[in-house]
Amino acid sequence: MPTISLFYGIAIQMFFEDHPPPHIHARYNEFKARYDISAGNLLSGELPRQAHRLVQEWIALNKQALMENWRRMEKGEQMEYIKGLE
C-alpha cells in the first residue's frame, strides 16, 4: 500500500486493486480511517478530531490529484506523491 502523502504525522495511502468508490486510507498513530475522495466523507474507522479535519481539508485541496492517482492505481500504474499540508 503506497503512501501518497504524509503531513502532521498522518499517512495517506491507497491500496492497489482496492474497491470503489474512490477513497483513501488515513493512518495516525494507532488510528485508521477511510475517506471518500469525492466528498471527503468518513467511510469507516476513526481519527482524532484535529487529524480528521486536516484529512478532510487535504482531500478538498487535492481532489483532482487524488482522482488521477485512483485512475493510475486502477491501471496498475505508479501513483504520484501529493504534497501534504504545511
Where are the regions that the model predicts?
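Basic nucleic-acid-binding interfaces
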Residues: M1-E86
